[in-house]
Regions:
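Conserved beta3 VAIK motif of the Hanks protein kinase fold
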Residues: 90
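The feature marks helicase ATPase cores and/or their adjacent C-terminal helical subdomains
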Residues: 1-86, 96-249
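Structured beta-strand/turn binding interfaces of compact recognition modules in eukaryotic regulators
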Residues: 93
Length: 249
């Protein structure tokens, strides 16, 4: 879905009539947005309006909704905003989920968005609609920090850019080889896509004595295995890798 640039005021006003809102979503290419996401965005708007009743601040404009990155890996971004010096990403959750799940998503988003430009600071947030708790991702400590909407509002630049910079990453590969790029692997300059995360989860949670991992060439099998090994090693487990090679005589 390629969203148009959304102004939160017009987004709210268009909801007064079902037909108008249906047309608004169509012309802005946000037909896939669901009711829980709409509710969360409405709450964010109301919080911003409390801080700026005139709604004239630039923080009300410049949003891309439901943007999908479909390069080598696949990710979806609920709210994105680009300005000359900053990228804002706000993820929307209807109910509270584990902090670990939130962190995994924001780490992936941080890596992708940080690849756009070294001149643009990246700020990542998650808003839980049910509890109205807002978290900011601390990239230094890789932790979630509960913050106020005033802090978020102040973090958003007045200016914005009407271009989705994710489109510039289409031909960029974010799957690395732990064999040939060990420095990137050990400095965590990679992430697993959704399918790889699911495969990793099955491996870690399996109660079987032997588990096999199958996949076509280039799907990241080695990366998954090395990632599992690194995680287990960091938790105090001892890991042994045995590499089987076929010798021709």
């Amino acid at each position: 879905m390629k969203s148009g640039v959304i102004n939160l005021v017009s987004f709210m006003e268009s909801q007064t009539d079902d037909d108008i809102f249906r047309y608004y979503k169509k012309i802005n290419h946000i037909e896939e947005i669901n009711d829980t996401e709409i509710e969360a965005i409405n709450k964010i708007f109301e919080k911003f309006k409390e801080l700026e009743p005139s709604c004239m601040n630039g923080a009300f404009s410049g949003y891309f909704l439901g943007t999908k990155y479909t390069g080598v890996v696949s990710e979806e971004f609920d709210m994105l905003r680009f300005s000359n010096q900053k990228i804002i990403n706000i993820e929307l959750k209807s109910t509270q989920i584990s902090e670990d799940r939130i962190l995994r998503q924001l780490k992936r988003h941080s890596y992708l968005l940080s690849s756009i430009s070294s001149d643009m600071e990246v700020s990542l947030y998650t808003f839980v609609s049910e509890t109205e708790i807002l978290y900011k991702f601390d990239e230094v400590t890789e932790t979630l920090i509960p913050i106020s909407f005033e802090q978020l509002f102040e973090d958003i630049s007045f200016d914005f850019i009407e271009y989705n910079y994710l489109e510039s990453l289409v031909n960029t590969s974010f799957i690395i080889s732990p064999y040939s790029e060990p420095d990137r692997f050990f400095s965590n300059q990679y992430f697993l896509n959704n399918e790889q995360e699911q495969a990793k989860k099955k491996l870690v949670e399996s109660s079987k004595k032997y588990v096999g991992l199958k996949g076509a060439a280039g799907t990241g099998k080695s990366l998954i295995l090395f990632d599992v090994a690194k995680e287990l090693s960091n938790s105090g487990e001892k890991i042994l890798f045995v590499f089987a090679l076929q010798f021709m005589i």
